[in-house]
Amino acid sequence: RKNKNFDRPPDEYKPTFRGMINSIPIELNIDSILIQNSAITYSELGVNKSKSGSIDITDINASIAGVTNMPQQQQRVGKALMKMEALLVGQSRLTTMLSIPYDKDAFSMSVNTTAMDLVKLNPTTKPLAGVDIISGQLHKIDFQMEGSENRANNTLIFDYQNLDLKIISDKGEKKGRKK
């Protein structure tokens, strides 16, 4: 759960995934982890909001492999790899892949979804953004990220149709409609 009513801490250097793994103070060598039939509800309280927005991810099946901070093992496995399939808000198939090579401070990630009724996102968008989704059909989301210590290159395809929104004022009344 995240509360955005607190001041943001000052920006500080944050290591890459490889840096985080390598900073673990004990020798670590995890061959694989399997996660089966799990669920997560992520909630966030927006700035000056009294109600949290949340999103449910269910039917999570994931594998994590090759997590190690031991140089000889890093050389042997080459990279840490995470693959996940899940169900987003009970409708959309969510597929995520994260690859962390051990020979450079970089990573690649992809996130893909299938079709869903966008109204299902209202428990997130109403409390956090003051947006009421009246109607809309998502065909797919394709997100690709290549990141390094200093930069990231991203591609996002958000394929939808017939999106109809209402903006909600801070007092809860409907302000205007956007199509």
PLM region spans:
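Short beta-strands and strand-coil junctions in structured, solvent-facing domains, enriched
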Residues: T41-S43, P71, L118, G130, ...
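Outer-membrane beta-barrel translocator domains and adjoining extracellular loop/strand segments
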Residues: N3, N48, S169-K171
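A short local loop/turn or secondary-structure capping micro-motif enriched for an aromatic residue
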Residues: K51, D103-K104, M116-V119, N162-L165
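Extended terminal
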Residues: S99-P101, N112, A129-K179
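Short, surface-exposed beta-strand/loop "edge" segments at domain boundaries and coil↔beta transitions
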Residues: L88-T96, D117-V119, D164-I167
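Transmembrane beta-strands of outer-membrane beta-barrel pores
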Residues: A39, D59, A115, Y160-N162
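Elongated, acidic membrane-bridging lipid-handling scaffolds
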Residues: P10-S108
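Extended amphipathic, helix-rich lipid-handling scaffolds
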Residues: R1-I40, V111-E146
